[in-house]
């Protein structure tokens, strides 16, 4: 008799996705971040659900409802800080996952990659709205600055911003709708994740060599289930160290001051995971130009397949492009640092140079290096 997991309509899908799935025998720990992102999403949805049970999305009570969660709700402080720091862990895993895809040429799975780019935008939108909900100073002014960027759109900009605000400034209507969107988006993300995996399972996983691995597959369970569990344990350890010992290290102290439209904080800046994009936005003196650069800084991921010039898939055997890749990583760290600095000399210049470098490396240098490597290896025909 065949096992029920291979026959049952629902269990069969789970079986073919997580148990009997043929996986390459040589995928490294860089392939762990997909499952870690799944765990992050589950943690965020569960902690978020429990927070939503006690949170009120009205400007007069939002700040005090978060205080109430931390002080009066059983383990409310734990749920709140797991949710806040869980977002940071989510983005760390997201950046590493995307970086892995860039390094090993996973973007050649076009459908999977494009859904992934949409997921990056969806997760960023969710996080941006989540940071508004506690209704502290940085919540209010962050929401004001970010929504105001849309006013740079010619002709319809101002109308669009006021439509999103639900009035002439960030106020009650804005907070309520941001809570609604922040609640619904993770479920849309979950649906997109299913589509992401659906497309991935059409082709099978990439692997560090970049070669076809059909000749050497192993079952996902037990080999990669146990490997994923190790990754999950490490992720939870890091998350709990953050939550229990340094819960506010990644937050902004200004957000412990209730929102006040009459008092602007000295330095308005987003959460750390948006700082690189914020630095690119600020590096262009023109408002519309900055917004375009901001969007392109993420959207550029979508054109990576078009910029691939090498005859090889990944960077495993390509030292020149490898060097450029790690310079790009260092450049992103510089942008992140600049995004958190005030707009003054020398930070303005450093930010502009780092922004130019970011686009130059991806659009010009890496494709050129790919062609050079083809010639060096005589892969010319």
Curated annotation (Swiss-Prot):
CDD domains: cytochrome_b_C (cd00290), Cytochrome_b_N (cd00284). Heme b b566 binds at residues 97, 196. It is found in: Mitochondrion inner membrane. Pfam families: Cytochrom_B_C (PF00032), Cytochrome_B (PF00033). It is a multi-pass membrane protein. GO terms for cellular component: mitochondrial inner membrane; respiratory chain complex III. GO terms for molecular function: metal ion binding; ubiquinol-cytochrome-c reductase activity. Keywords: Electron transport, Heme, Iron, Membrane, Metal-binding, Mitochondrion, Mitochondrion inner membrane, Respiratory chain, Transmembrane, Transmembrane helix, Transport, Ubiquinone. The keyword NADP does not apply. SUPFAM superfamilies: a domain/subunit of cytochrome bc1 complex (Ubiquinol-cytochrome c reductase), Transmembrane di-heme cytochromes. Its cofactor is heme b. GO terms for biological process: mitochondrial electron transport, ubiquinol to cytochrome c. A ubiquinone binds at residue 201. Binds 2 heme b groups non-covalently. Component of the ubiquinol-cytochrome c reductase complex (complex III or cytochrome b-c1 complex) that is part of the mitochondrial respiratory chain. The b-c1 complex mediates electron transfer from ubiquinol to cytochrome c. Contributes to the generation of a proton gradient across the mitochondrial membrane that is then used for ATP synthesis. Belongs to the cytochrome b family. The cytochrome bc1 complex contains 11 subunits: 3 respiratory subunits (MT-CYB, CYC1 and UQCRFS1), 2 core proteins (UQCRC1 and UQCRC2) and 6 low-molecular weight proteins (UQCRH/QCR6, UQCRB/QCR7, UQCRQ/QCR8, UQCR10/QCR9, UQCR11/QCR10 and a cleavage product of UQCRFS1). This cytochrome bc1 complex then forms a dimer. Heme 1 (or BL or b562) is low-potential and absorbs at about 562 nm, and heme 2 (or BH or b566) is high-potential and absorbs at about 566 nm. This is Cytochrome b. It comes from Reithrodontomys sumichrasti (Sumichrast's harvest mouse).
């Amino acid at each position: 008799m065949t096992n029920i997991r291979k026959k049952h309509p629902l269990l069969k899908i789970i079986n073919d996705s997580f148990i009997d799935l043929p996986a390459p025998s040589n995928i490294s720990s860089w392939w762990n971040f997909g499952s870690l992102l799944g765990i992050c999403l589950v943690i965020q949805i569960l902690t978020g659900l429990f927070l939503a049970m006690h949170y009120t999305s009205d400007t007069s009570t939002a700040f005090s409802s978060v205080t109430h969660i931390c002080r009066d709700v059983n383990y409310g402080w734990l749920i709140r800080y797991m949710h806040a720091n869980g977002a940071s862990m989510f983005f760390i895993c997201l950046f590493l996952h995307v970086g892995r895809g860039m390094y090993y040429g996973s973007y050649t799975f076009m459908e999977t990659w494009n859904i992934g780019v949409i997921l990056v935008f969806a997760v960023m939108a969710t996080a941006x709205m989540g940071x508004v909900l506690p209704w502290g100073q940085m919540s209010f002014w962050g929401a004001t600055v970010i929504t105001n960027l849309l006013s740079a759109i010619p002709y319809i900009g101002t109308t669009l911003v006021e439509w999103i605000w639900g009035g002439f400034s960030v106020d009650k209507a804005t907070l309520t709708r941001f809570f609604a969107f922040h609640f619904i988006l993770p479920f849309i993300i979950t649906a997109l994740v299913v589509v992401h995996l659906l497309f991935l399972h059409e082709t099978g996983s990439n692997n560090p060599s970049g070669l076809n691995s059909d000749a050497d597959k192993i079952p996902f369970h037990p080999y990669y289930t146990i490997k994923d569990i190790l990754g999950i344990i490490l992720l939870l350890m890091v998350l709990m160290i953050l939550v229990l010992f340094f819960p506010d290290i990644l937050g902004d102290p200004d957000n412990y001051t209730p929102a006040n439209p009459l008092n602007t904080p000295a330095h308005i800046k987003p959460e750390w995971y948006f700082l690189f994009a914020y630095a690119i936005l600020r590096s262009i003196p023109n408002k519309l130009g900055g917004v375009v650069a901001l969007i392109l800084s993420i959207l550029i991921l979508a054109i990576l397949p078009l910029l691939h010039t090498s005859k090889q898939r990944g960077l495993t055997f390509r030292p020149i492009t490898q060097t450029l890749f790690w310079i790009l990583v260092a450049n992103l760290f510089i942008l992140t640092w600049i995004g958190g600095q005030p707009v003054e000399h020398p930070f303005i210049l450093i930010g502009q140079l780092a922004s130019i470098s970011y686009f130059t490396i991806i659009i010009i240098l890496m494709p050129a290096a790919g062609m050079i490597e083809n010639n060096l290896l005589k892969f010319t025909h």
